[in-house]
Structure formats: structure tokens, C-alpha cells
Amino acid sequence: MVSWMICRLVVLIFGMLYPAYASYKAVKSKNIREYVRWMMYWIVFAIFMAAETFTDIFISWFPFYYEIKMAFVLWLLSPYTKGASLLYRKFVHPSLSRHEKEIDACIVQAKERSYETMLSFGKRSLNMAASAAVQAATKSQGALAGRLRSFSMQDLRSIPDTSAPTYQDPLYLEDQAPRRRPPIGYRPGGLQDSDTEDECWSDNEIAPQPPVRPREKPLSRSQSLRVVKRKPLVREGTSRSLKVRTRKKTIPSDLDS
């Protein structure tokens, strides 16, 4: 464990940070010789990092593995040994020059295939998203229609008729007292339907009703047009006064004769 931590520190400091600063100085000074040297180092170090990924998995159990790795990084970086330039000139450059065309063709094919795969993946994802949205919309519509159908007329009639809440003034509680609802079939004139009257009251409480009289025959048209003429009543006093007056007039005629 200690050797692994020391190895990681050596690779981080001497394998990455110091070469990065030296490359910056070479680019700034525009020294072509130093620029080429550090470019060769970075190529070799990239290959070393790729190989290290697999060797740490399969060969890390080998004794003195981390010590050998630290020594190899220092050998690549040392200006006395110039291990990076040596490996590049003898192994890396000849192998890359031999397989350069094949590597370029593979890179071009990889770019084209990656572009095509990205397009196909994007189309599939859009189709899947559209189908999912359509299915969700249809399911929601079906659920809404089912809920609306479940409400029958009986369910709607069974909803209690709750009146809206009203504000009650504490000073006028008597005027605002709720009135009792009249019984079913009640009419404001004191009249009630016969059917509702039987429903509201029991048999013992119902008042006995008089028998219904048969209706008289309607008058005919001729009878309705006749007018009954009555003789005017003559007072007895007036008739007697008239008789007396007539008698008084006839008396002097008898005396003359």
C-alpha cells in the first residue's frame, strides 16, 4: 500500500506536472529543439499510461512492480538517459510510420460510423419519445372517459344540496334564524295535494272528508236566455189613499141633484 502511494506521487509530480511546465517554457521560448524533445516525451508517456491501465489489473501482484514503474518514469524524464527520445526513435516512430495509412483509415471510418450511429440513435430516441407521449395521452383520455361514464344520474342526485354559507350578524340573529322547510306537497294557500297529504300524515291523523256531491245538470241554452219577470210590489197605503180621494170628489155631485 505504501509503495502504491509513493508510485502515484512520483508519476503525478515527475511524470505529469514537471513535463507540463517544461513544455510551456519550450512553447514560450520558441525553442524548436526543446519543443521536439517534449513532444516525443508526451507521445511515449501516453503509450505508457495506456499500458499501465492493463498492467495494474493483471501484473500488480508481481514483486517490486511499483518500484519498477517509478524507476521507468524517472528513466524517461532524465536528461542524462533521454529514455523517451530513445524509445520514440527506435520503436514508436518506425511502427507508426508503417501503419500510418491503416490508422488514418480506421480513424475516418470511426468518425463516419459514429456520426451515423448518433443520427440513428437520435431518430430512435425521438420516435420512442413520441410514441410514449401518444400512449400517455390515450391512456389519460380513456381514464377520463371512464370516470365520466361512472357518474350515473342516481349518483348525481345523491349529491347533497348544500346551501352556500352566509354571514350571520350577531345583532340580528332572530331575523337571520333559519326557517324550517315546509313538508313535501305544501302549498302557500293552505292547499295540499291529496297524494302528498297521505304521505305526510298517517291514517289516524287524516281528517274525514265529506262525501262529494254530484254536480247539477248544466242549464240549457234556452233556459239561460229566459229572464224571470217579477211584478212590482205595490204598497197598500198608496192604494187606500187613492180610493179615499176618489170618494171625496163624488160627494158634491149627489148634493146638487
UniProtKB/Swiss-Prot annotation:
Top-level division of the source organism's lineage: Eukaryota
Positions of modified residues (Phosphoserine): 152, 194, 202, 253
GO molecular function (one): microtubule binding
Transmembrane segments: 1-21, 42-62
Main localization category: endoplasmic reticulum
Membrane topology of this protein: Multi-pass membrane protein
One family name in Pfam for this protein: TB2_DP1_HVA22
Keywords from the named record: Cell cycle, Cell division, Endoplasmic reticulum, Membrane, Microtubule, Mitosis, Phosphoprotein, Transmembrane, Transmembrane helix
Zinc recorded as keyword: no
Subcellular location: Endoplasmic reticulum membrane
Region annotated Disordered, chain positions: 159-257
PTM annotation (Phosphothreonine): residues: 196, 250
Residue pairs linked by disulfide bridges in the UniProt entry: none
Family recorded in the similarity comment: Belongs to the DP1 family.
Function as written in the Swiss-Prot or TrEMBL entry: Microtubule-binding protein required to ensure proper cell division and nuclear envelope reassembly by sequestering the endoplasmic reticulum away from chromosomes during mitosis. Probably acts by clearing the endoplasmic reticulum membrane from metaphase chromosomes.
Protein name listed in UniProt: Receptor expression-enhancing protein 4
